[in-house]
Amino acid sequence: HSVYPDAITIAEEVSGMPGLAAPIEDGGFGFDYRLSMNIPDFWTKLITDHPDEEWSPGAIWYELTNRREDEKTISYAESHDQALVGDKTLISRRADADMYWHMSRSSRTLITDRAIALDKLIRLATATTMNGGYLNFMGNEFGHPEWIDFPREGNGWSYHYARRQWSLADNADLLYHDLQEFDRAMVRFIDSVKAFHSLPIEQYHIH
């Protein structure tokens, strides 16, 4: 910050070391934010190991708000860890092959509708419980169906999957378009509320 006063610094760290995003004058490291890396891992495990009708609201609340109040954090539902080859995005874990064959308005299925609804719920819960900022990863905001795979020896140095198909989100006949519109409306709402990122978050009741 002494070199670039307007720079934004974000710490990517998994041990939970205190003080990373605390001011230097308070004994911290001075980062502006730290990534809430527990959140995407939690969502992945929850979707993989538990049917959604068994999800615990209390466990979800705890994981989304498990942080130090004096450190600003960046909340996110998923990132490159889930989108790279060998893994699956959250929506792909629910929709699976239907992501390729039933994402048009004329061929939608209960599987795709349920996967889309859960994906929206996950992102809304993650974004609205943030304490600093919310992060999207390229393409995840509209449920991109393919993984990312950069050119390497194992894929013959192919660029085929080193891409995002933005045209899917631009096509109003596809449900990818609806996902992007939801994400856009959610982010605009958050941005419209003054100091949303620092509003107090309280749990009143969990049924």
Task: Enumerate the language-model features and the residues they cover.
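Conserved alpha/beta catalytic core and glycan-binding cleft of carbohydrate-active enzymes
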Residues: 1-162, 191-207
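Catalytic cores of secreted or luminal carbohydrate-active enzymes
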Residues: 161-195
